[in-house]
Structures are given as structure tokens and as C-alpha cells.
């Protein structure tokens, strides 16, 4: 009985450790990378598939992934996306290249640079606004009574305690937080709360509209994308943080957070993470639903606004005249807390009139300040709740919210079935706009969720303003002050629409100045297609429509020299979201934006001047996109050695310290011969038990396979292990391959290629559907292309299913060198299926099936062809005299 008890205890401990390894909160993995040296010396690599689990990236430092190769740090860094995936940021200056929205991102900045940039922006805003930097930027709603304050105070034990010292926040970006570690399923009231808070609660504005002069209300209406988006297969992320400063916590494999289908208005598509690509949402199976909520049917131009406002048809209290708070409002200490303060148009123009005003207002408040609370007749959970952490997603649903809720408020959040004005219709109108949020601050990765949307270009549109300052055809440059002095207000334009015919009219789009003839097609493209025109098209229109500046032949020469001089300096990006069309990024820092206000067609292509902080601003034609591959120069900088190179990807976190993800980079030559080997059912005896029994310590390996693979590798062949397992099982699978030991003989080293998809998706595809060829064909084809000009790098392959045979045939493996094995250990050669063998028998004739590869630069003997057994012991040829031949012919 003691023996049985010890055995049961050992099994329990083993299963417990296995569960910890598969825990969705800690599941991370890295797929090995293959680097191929080309004949000309260039290097090509397979994609860097790295994924961190949720606990590993909780409150990470700037979402930057550090890389160590062979124990030494390298200068390259990766960035962390919302799905936990790591990717490189590639700079591109191609005007014609259109970057998809799910691939657009912001540059990676060092901690010191981003901190300096934050201080620079805050200092500039404080000087212009005349505010104390330590003033907390939060608004207290008039409806906040002592009872609501007590409720908020009661919840602070399980929620983040916001600090009031903004200077201390900027010095220490990692705030102390005490909150729930895992999200709970959201109910509709919680979803509505986050939906409304991210939209800055437009329905609560009308009660204050009568108290504020209309001429002071010229607010930009910004609607951040508030609907949820997928993170990994069959999972959905919480709504983005209202502040937009950081995206929510990356979900991990096998975690499922359900959302209401009424809130999204359509069935949630799954996330697809294919080989060599970044995760992105699968296309909807019902496209007609998307058409019902087309952005063209519900979009209006908001009065007093430079932005397009998206109105819900069910919101009867929201009108065109309703101003909306942008990110938050400022609290004047000299006025009662019950008075709501707004940001007027004059202040916004002073701040630079950049396109997304949300990040500018964000700089006026601490990064983790409480969410803006607005007034309403009754208190609701969405009004009393503090803003959650920037990293954590959906909060739990608390019972006191349901019991204390007013019946009228409950009717708003829990509509009856069939109510056309309920939450379902409200969400369906905006369901088509479900997308990832744009990065709202330096180093943020809000755009990194990998979700495409019908409104990708909507939030990228720059600000628009008009003025009668003139100067486009004169010899003077348009300044900000001159533009603001003659700025045209909304009321002036209503009274006199013929202003567009005034020759002094100047249209400011983003940071550029145009006449009306040039600006008209630009504005039409923004309104009709929600995306700006490409830079090449804009330049063509400007050449035809913009007035020529005659008599200034020296100016273009000076601008050309200035451009060359500035482009020769090392580029260092400060802030901003990458624009695929090459337009001026609207989210540059405030100081940088003031520096490079260009006004003429001759100055359009001139680079921006450096700011006083010593940084070079983002060039107008430079954009940034995600990539999983490195260039040849970047690969050479890694200083890889031939064969395996240990690589460690690490993310610094506040609570867990440093989360590390280990892998291997293999440097091979273009003429190497590769042997492909499956794992489940090929090295192990069966598929399902091959996942479980080795973890419990049971040897479930085919007999003789380790010796066979070892002898084949000694003949000069490289091994590649390809399995349809998920990336989260990389460490477990890699450990199993190292654990296999057959009387002192181990498996040869080789790259481990796994599916980048989630755990359950990969298990379902391989074990249930039994269709691993979906992944294998795509993966092996990509690896094959790295060996070009060698079109047949794969010499032989081992598998256990007809699907494996199909995959190997697709990548050019010869049929007579494809071997399949069954659970009994019977090895079959595909071109002669009646000839049944085994790993042990094949090992006896390994030199005939896998002959020794002889190459002058890799052989043990430099002259192996001269000093081999045959050439050394053979009899010399007898001398041959050709004199008789010449005499006979004569």
C-alpha cells in the first residue's frame, strides 16, 4: 500500500507540474529560427515566432522584448503585441507602399528617450496652458455624491489606487497596483460601462450644454474603437483602456473570455495566426451583416469639430451640437468641483491642431489618472467605477452593482428582447467598427492587436482647419500665429459659405497648408474612403493646383541641400503612429510639431528640423510596420556561428521580474541537405499518448530511431523537426527531444518548427481533424525558399500519416525517400509499400540510403577524394605508349 501511495503521489505531482506548464496564464513559447547563408554571402531567415503568456507580460516595461544570443545582448529589440506576440519594427520610406492596418505600428524607443519625450511634451503643454504640472487631470461629475464616493472607496482594495503626483508617475512608469489578476466574464452592464467610458460618455453631455457659451464649445469628437477584438484562437480581449495609453493584457493560449453576441452585433470570428504572419482576425462568414452597419450610413460631420463623429441611431439624446470631452477635461482648482471644464478650440489650436487630440490631452493628466466621470440623473456602475489598469482588461462583475442599480438605469443596460432601441441595436451599429486602437502614446502598442476593420483609416485622418491668412503665393512663410489670427470659425463659414472662393483661403490638413483647389480632392478622399491620398498623388495635385513661386530659384536649391544634410544624420523617431500612405504622422510630440510647420509645395519634401531636445523628428515619408524577419545586415550584426546558437527573448515585468523565452537560431548553408522528421507518431509511438506519457516519465519512443538519426547526421545531413503542435508547447517538445536517449545515443540537434496558433486550435487540428498538412505545407515551403538557388534542399522525410506524405511531396521530397511508420514500429517506404522494414533495419544500411556527403569546405579530410580507401589501395594504371598508334596511321 505504501508503494501504491507513493506512486499515486508521484503521478499527482507530475500532473500538477504538467498543468503548471500548460497554465494559460504562463504559457509562452518560441519557435526555432533557421538562417541560411546564400552563395553571395547574404543571409535569409525564417520568421521569429515568439509568444509570451499573460502572466509573463503583465505590466511589462514599455512592451519591449530584449534579445540575447549566446549569452550576449544584441542591439535589436522586439515589440510586444496585444496577443502576446513579439515582432520587429521595420522602417519604410516607400511612398507607394500601402501598409495594412494590422501591420502598422509605432517605433520602439528606449526608456530614456521615451521618458525625455514625455517630459518635453508635458513641459510644453504646461507652459502653454499655464498649469501646474502636479495638478491632477481628472474631472469630478456633479452627480458624484458622498454615497457614490463611498462606493468607490469601498472598491479600492481590489482595484488600482491612482496616485496624484504626476511628476512621480513620469519618473516611475510602473505604477503600484493592487487588483484582480484574472478577468471574469463580463455581463452586459460591464460591457456597456467600458463601451461608454471609452467613448467618453457622449450621452451625458447635454445636461451641461446650456450652461456653457456656444462659442467656447468647439471640441473635437473622438470615438476610440471600443468594441472588443480577438486575441488568439477562439478568445476575445476586453475593451481597450479608455485612456488609450496602453492596450489591454495579452490573452494567452486556451483562455476563453466570452462576450455577448448582442454587444458585437455579429458572431465573433476566430483569430488566425498562420506561419510567417502576425495574428489577425478571420474574415466574417456573414458579410451582409457588415453592410448593414456600413460606416457611410451612420457617419455625420460634427459641428464645431475637425473630426468625423460616428452617431448611433438609437442615441436620441445625442445631437450634432453636443460637444464631447477629448480624453479628459481639466479641473480648475479655483472653481467648484461640480463644474465641468471643456477644452475650447483656441486651446486646441495652441496645442498644435494635431489630428488625434486624445494623446495631447493625455499628456495633461497622469498616465493612470481616474477615468472622467460625467453627470447623469442617477448613479450607475459605469459612472462610479474607477478606470482599471492599463494592462488588465475586463474587470469582474460585482453584485452590489446589480442590487443597488436603479430600475430605470437597469432598463438601459438590460433591455427586453426585441427592443429595437436596446443595447443590441446600439452595438450592431458600431459592430462593424470593431478594431484595434491606434497607439496613443510613445511606445504603446495599441495598434498591435492584429485586427483589420472597415474603419482602419478613419482614426488616422488628420485635423482640418481653414483660415484667410493667405500667403501661399507670396514670398513669406505661413506661421501658426498668422494662421490663427485669420482662422475661420464654424459660424463664419455658415454665414458666408463663399469663403471657399476667397483667394486668401488656406486649408490646413494636419500640419500642411493648401489652397482650396488642392485641398478639395484630399478632403473628398477622407470623407468618401476614410483614408488620405497617397503622397505621390498629393504631390501631383500640388504641382498642378498650387501657385508657383517664381523668382525664388535659390529656395528650392536651399531646400534640397537642407534635405540632403538632414537625411545624412542618423534617424531617431520620437513618437507617432506609422502612416502607410506617407502622410505626416499626426501624433508627433508637441515641440516637434511646432518646429516643422511647412507651408509650400517646395517645402513639402524637406525634412523636419531637429528639436531642442536633441532628437530628430519623424520624417513625413517614413512609416513603420511590423515584421517577423530580419534583413541580411541585421542578421550579420547578430554574429551567429555555424550550427546552433542559443537565443533568449526576455520581457521585464514589475512583479515577475524578467520573463524569459528560450529558443535556438541555426545557421546553415544554402547547399545543406535536410532530413524532415515529424514528432507525434514518428518519434513517439502514437499521437495522443505521445503528448502525455513522456511527460509522466514513460518512454514512448520508437526503438532504434535515435541511433538511425544519429548515424544519418554523422553523414552530413541536417535534421529539421516539424510538428503541428502549438507554439505554447515549444519548451515541452524541445525538452522531450533532448530527453530521448537510447543507450547513450541521443537525437541530433535541429530546429523545432511548430504552429504559431493557440494550444486548443493546434490540438484540434492535429489530433481531432488529423489535418496537420495545413500548417506543414506552408511552413516547409517557406523554409524551402530560403535555400534558393538550391531548389531541392529536403533529401528525405519521416512521418506517420498520409497527410505527412502529402506535405512532403508538396515541398519536393522524392517519393522513394519518404518513410512512414505505424504504431507497431513498421517502417514503409512510399514507393515500395510492400517492403516493410523498421528503424533498426534501416540503420544497418544507412550508408546506402543516406550516403556520405563530401564537400571540400565541410569534410573532415581536406582531400577526401584523393586519400580515400579506394584511391589509396587501388593498383596504378599501366603506362600507355602511343608511338605504335602514330606509326600505324602513317
Curated annotation (Swiss-Prot):
It catalyses: a 1,2-diacyl-sn-glycero-3-phosphate + H2O = a 1,2-diacyl-sn-glycerol + phosphate. Its cofactor is Mg(2+); Mn(2+). SMART domains: LNS2. A motif (DXDXT motif) lies at residues 678-682. It is found in: Cytoplasm, Cytosol; Endoplasmic reticulum membrane; Nucleus membrane. Residues 624-830 are annotated as: C-LIP. Keywords: Acetylation, Cytoplasm, Endoplasmic reticulum, Fatty acid metabolism, Hydrolase, Isopeptide bond, Lipid metabolism, Membrane, Nucleus, Phosphoprotein, Transcription, Transcription regulation, Ubl conjugation. Residues 152-161 have a biased composition (Basic residues). Changing residue 425 to R: Decreased acetylation by KAT5. Specifically expressed in skeletal muscle. Also abundant in adipose tissue. Lower levels in some portions of the digestive tract. Its EC number is 3.1.3.4. Residues 1-108 are annotated as: N-LIP. It comes from the Eukaryota. One of its GO terms (biological process) is fatty acid catabolic process. Phosphorylated at multiple sites by mTOR in response to insulin, leading to its inactivation. Phosphorylation does not affect the catalytic activity but regulates the localization. Phosphorylation is decreased by epinephrine. Dephosphorylated by the CTDNEP1-CNEP1R1 complex. Dephosphorylation following mTOR inhibition promotes its activity. Acetylation at Lys-425 and Lys-595 by KAT5 in response to fatty acids promotes translocation to the endoplasmic reticulum and synthesis of diacylglycerol. It holds the Pfam family LNS2. One of its GO terms (cellular component) is cytoplasm. Acts as a magnesium-dependent phosphatidate phosphatase enzyme which catalyzes the conversion of phosphatidic acid to diacylglycerol during triglyceride, phosphatidylcholine and phosphatidylethanolamine biosynthesis and therefore controls the metabolism of fatty acids at different levels. Is involved in adipocyte differentiation. Recruited at the mitochondrion outer membrane and is involved in mitochondrial fission by converting phosphatidic acid to diacylglycerol. May represent a candidate gene for human lipodysytropy syndromes. It is linked to Myoglobinuria, acute recurrent, autosomal recessive: Recurrent myoglobinuria is characterized by recurrent attacks of rhabdomyolysis (necrosis or disintegration of skeletal muscle) associated with muscle pain and weakness and followed by excretion of myoglobin in the urine. Renal failure may occasionally occur. This is Phosphatidate phosphatase LPIN1. It comes from Homo sapiens (Human). The gene is LPIN1.
Amino acid at each position: 500500500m505504501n508503494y501504491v501511495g507513493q506512486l499515486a503521489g508521484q503521478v499527482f505531482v507530475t500532473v500538477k507540474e504538467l498543468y503548471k506548464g500548460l497554465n494559460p496564464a504562463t504559457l509562452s513559447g518560441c519557435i526555432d529560427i533557421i538562417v541560411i547563408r546564400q552563395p553571395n554571402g547574404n543571409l535569409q531567415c525564417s520568421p521569429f515566432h515568439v509568444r509570451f503568456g499573460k502572466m509573463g507580460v503583465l505590466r511589462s516595461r514599455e512592451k519591449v522584448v530584449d534579445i540575447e544570443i549566446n549569452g550576449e545582448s544584441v542591439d535589436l529589440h522586439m515589440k510586444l503585441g496585444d496577443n502576446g506576440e513579439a515582432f520587429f519594427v521595420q522602417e519604410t520610406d516607400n511612398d507607394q507602399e500601402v501598409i495594412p492596418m494590422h501591420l502598422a505600428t509605432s517605433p520602439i524607443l528606449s526608456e530614456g528617450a521615451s521618458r525625455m519625450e514625455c517630459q518635453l511634451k508635458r513641459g510644453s503643454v504646461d507652459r502653454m496652458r499655464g498649469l501646474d504640472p502636479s495638478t491632477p487631470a481628472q474631472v469630478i461629475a456633479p452627480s458624484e455624491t458622498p454615497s457614490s464616493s463611498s462606493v468607490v472607496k469601498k472598491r479600492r482594495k481590489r482595484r488600482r489606487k491612482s496616485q496624484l503626483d504626476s511628476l512621480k508617475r513620469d519618473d516611475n512608469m510602473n505604477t503600484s497596483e493592487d487588483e484582480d489578476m484574472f478577468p471574469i466574464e463580463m455581463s452586459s452592464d460591464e460591457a456597456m460601462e467600458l463601451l461608454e467610458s471609452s467613448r467618453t460618455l457622449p450621452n451625458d453631455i447635454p445636461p451641461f450644454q446650456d450652461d456653457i457659451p456656444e462659442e467656447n464649445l468647439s471640441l473635437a469628437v473622438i470615438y476610440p474603437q471600443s468594441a472588443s477584438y480577438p486575441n488568439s484562437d477562439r478568445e476575445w480581449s476586453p475593451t481597450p483602456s479608455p485612456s488609450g495609453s496602453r492596450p489591454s493584457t495579452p490573452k494567452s493560449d486556451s483562455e476563453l473570455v466570452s462576450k455577448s453576441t448582442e454587444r458585437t452585433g455579429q458572431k465573433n470570428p476566430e483569430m488566425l495566426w498562420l506561419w510567417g504572419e502576425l495574428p489577425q482576425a478571420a474574415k466574417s462568414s456573414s458579410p451582409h451583416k457588415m453592410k448593414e452597419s456600413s460606416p457611410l450610413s451612420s457617419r455625420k460631420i460634427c459641428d464645431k469639430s475637425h473630426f468625423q463623429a460616428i452617431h448611433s441611431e438609437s442615441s436620441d439624446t445625442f445631437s450634432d451640437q453636443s460637444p464631447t470631452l477629448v480624453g479628459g477635461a481639466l479641473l480648475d482648482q479655483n472653481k467648484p468641483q461640480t463644474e465641468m471644464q471643456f477644452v475650447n478650440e483656441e486651446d486646441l489650436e495652441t496645442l498644435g491642431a494635431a489630428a488625434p487630440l486624445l494623446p495631447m490631452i493625455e499628456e495633461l493628466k497622469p498616465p493612470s489618472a481616474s477615468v472622467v466621470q460625467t453627470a447623469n440623473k442617477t448613479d450607475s456602475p459605469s459612472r462610479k467605477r474607477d478606470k482599471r489598469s492599463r494592462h488588465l482588461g475586463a474587470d469582474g462583475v460585482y453584485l452590489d452593482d446589480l442590487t443597488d442599480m436603479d430600475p430605470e438605469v437597469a432598463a438601459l443596460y438590460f433591455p427586453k428582447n426585441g427592443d429595437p432601441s436596446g443595447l443590441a441595436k446600439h452595438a450592431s451599429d458600431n459592430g462593424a467598427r470593431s478594431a484595434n486602437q491606434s497607439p496613443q502614446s510613445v511606445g504603446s502598442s495599441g495598434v498591435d492587436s492584429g485586427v483589420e476593420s472597415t474603419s482602419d483609416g478613419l482614426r488616422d485622418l488628420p485635423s482640418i482647419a481653414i483660415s484667410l491668412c493667405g500667403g501661399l503665393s507670396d514670398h513669406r512663410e505661413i506661421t501658426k500665429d498668422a494662421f490663427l489670427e485669420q482662422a475661420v470659425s464654424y459660424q463664419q463659414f455658415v454665414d458666408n459659405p463663399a469663403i471657399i472662393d476667397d483667394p486668401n483661403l488656406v486649408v490646413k490638413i494636419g500640419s500642411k497648408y493648401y489652397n482650396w483647389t488642392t485641398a478639395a480632392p484630399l478632403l473628398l478622399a477622407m470623407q468618401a474612403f476614410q483614408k488620405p491620398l497617397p503622397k505621390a498623388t498629393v504631390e501631383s495635385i500640388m504641382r498642378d493646383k498650387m501657385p508657383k513661386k517664381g523668382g525664388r530659384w535659390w529656395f528650392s536649391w536651399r531646400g534640397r541641400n537642407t534635405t540632403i544634410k538632414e537625411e545624412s544624420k542618423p534617424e531617431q523617431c520620437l513618437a507617432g503612429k506609422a502612416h502607410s500612405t506617407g502622410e505626416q504622422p499626426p501624433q508627433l510630440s508637441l515641440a516637434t510639431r511646432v518646429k516643422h510647420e511647412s507651408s509650400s509645395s517646395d517645402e513639402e519634401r524637406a525634412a523636419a528640423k531637429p528639436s531642442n531636445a536633441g532628437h530628430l523628428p519623424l520624417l513625413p515619408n517614413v512609416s513603420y510596420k511590423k515584421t517577423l524577419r530580419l534583413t541580411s545586415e541585421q542578421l550579420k550584426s547578430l554574429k551567429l556561428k555555424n550550427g546552433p546558437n542559443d537565443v533568449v527573448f526576455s520581457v521585464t515585468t514589475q512583479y515577475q521580474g524578467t520573463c524569459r523565452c528560450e529558443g535556438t537560431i541555426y545557421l546553415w548553408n544554402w547547399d545543406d541537405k535536410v532530413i524532415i522528421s515529424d514528432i507525434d507518431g514518428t518519434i513517439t509511438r502514437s499521437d495522443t499518448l505521445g503528448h502525455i506519457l513522456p511527460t509522466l516519465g514513460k518512454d514512448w519512443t520508437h526503438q532504434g530511431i535515435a541511433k538511425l538519426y544519429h548515424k544519418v547526421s554523422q553523414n552530413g545531413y541536417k535534421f529539421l523537426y516539424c510538428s503541428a503542435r502549438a507554439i505554447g508547447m515549444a519548451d515541452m517538445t524541445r525538452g522531450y527531444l533532448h530527453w530521448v536517449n537510447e543507450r547513450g545515443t541521443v537525437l541530433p540537434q535541429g530546429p523545432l518548427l511548430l504552429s504559431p496558433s493557440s494550444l486548443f486550435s493546434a490540438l484540434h487540428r492535429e489530433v481531432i481533424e488529423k489535418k496537420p498538412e495545413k500548417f506543414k505545407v506552408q511552413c516547409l515551403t517557406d523554409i524551402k525558399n530560403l535555400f534558393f538557388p538550391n531548389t531541392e534542399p529536403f533529401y528525405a522525410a519521416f512521418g506517420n500519416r498520409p497527410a505527412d506524405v502529402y506535405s512532403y511531396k508538396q515541398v519536393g521530397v522524392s517519393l522513394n525517400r519518404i518513410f512512414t511508420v505505424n504504431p507497431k514500429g513498421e517502417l514503409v517506404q512510399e514507393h515500395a509499400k510492400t517492403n516493410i522494414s523498421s528503424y533498426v533495419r534501416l540503420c544497418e544500411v544507412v550508408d546506402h540510403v543516406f550516403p556520405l556527403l563530401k564537400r571540400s569546405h565541410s569534410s573532415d579530410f581536406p582531400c577526401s577524394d584523393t586519400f580515400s580507401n579506394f584511391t589509396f589501395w587501388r593498383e596504378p594504371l599501366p603506362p600507355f605508349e602511343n608511338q605504335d598508334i602514330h606509326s600505324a596511321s602513317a
